[in-house]
Amino acid sequence: MKDLFLFSNLLNHSHAFVYAFHFCLVALIILIVAYIARSKMQLVPRGLQNIVEAYLEGVISMGKDTLGSEKLARKYLPLVATIGFIVFFSNVIGIIPGFESPSSSLNLTLVLALVVFIYYNFEGIRENGFFKYFGHFMGPNKFLAPIMFPVEVISHLSRVVSLSFRLFGNIKGDDLFLLAMLTLAPWFAPLPAFALLTLMAVLQTFIFMMLTYVYLAGAVAISEHEH
């Protein structure tokens, strides 16, 4: 039923094309926003530059609170801020009738979760060394190490599942809710729903970015605590 509302169906009806088309559209929007914000930069921010700078400062503040270091927060800013842009615009675009949320596809959310998973483990190994990082999985008690290590490995792998399915499930549910509202009352009744779904899109973006910083904090915490 949702396909009836999609403009992309004018080009191709396949689900793979629909999600690829809307992800490319999201990427284009992000590039345009970045270009406009950078092309007219002023000492006193105005317009879009002001919004983007406020967003970046908010991400840095979030990272500082999570990591306990502004230096580390700025170090991981490009990753977290980029993921935030992708998740936000992927969520919001689906609220507009005729468009689909790329984040309502498990493919995208799984890729984003894998990027976070691979990167924070890479940072953990780079900061602490291979043996020290994975040795931390065994816990402080050597006798419990054979039990703790597989438990920790499973716990870390489950983060990929929780990150991807949380975002996918929430946005897919939002899409179905919006579809029901548009079907039952296509004009004025969905307006409160649009506001609620926008709030949910922002909330899911915040959660994804926060968890990214939390996982990074856990990965680099071994060496940071020693310093």
Swiss-Prot record:
Membrane topology: Multi-pass membrane protein
Segments passing through the bilayer: 16-36, 79-99, 105-125, 176-196, 202-222
SUPFAM superfamilies (UniProt xref): F1F0 ATP synthase subunit A
GO biological process assignments: proton motive force-driven plasma membrane ATP synthesis
GO molecular function, one term: proton-transporting ATP synthase activity, rotational mechanism
Pfam family, any one: ATP-synt_A
Gene3D superfamilies in UniProt: ATP synthase, F0 complex, subunit A
Subcellular location: Cell inner membrane
GO cellular component: plasma membrane; proton-transporting ATP synthase complex
Keyword tRNA processing recorded: no
Secretion signal, residue range per the UniProt entry: none
Keywords per UniProt: ATP synthesis, Cell inner membrane, Cell membrane, CF(0), Hydrogen ion transport, Ion transport, Membrane, Transmembrane, Transmembrane helix, Transport
Quaternary structure, from the entry: F-type ATPases have 2 components, CF(1) - the catalytic core - and CF(0) - the membrane proton channel. CF(1) has five subunits: alpha(3), beta(3), gamma(1), delta(1), epsilon(1). CF(0) has three main subunits: a(1), b(2) and c(9-12). The alpha and beta chains form an alternating ring which encloses part of the gamma chain. CF(1) is attached to CF(0) by a central stalk formed by the gamma and epsilon chains, while a peripheral stalk is formed by the delta and b chains.
Protein family: Belongs to the ATPase A chain family.
Function of the molecule: Key component of the proton channel; it plays a direct role in the translocation of protons across the membrane.
PANTHER family: ATP SYNTHASE SUBUNIT A, CHLOROPLASTIC
Protein name as it appears in the record: ATP synthase subunit a
Protein species of origin: Campylobacter concisus (strain 13826)
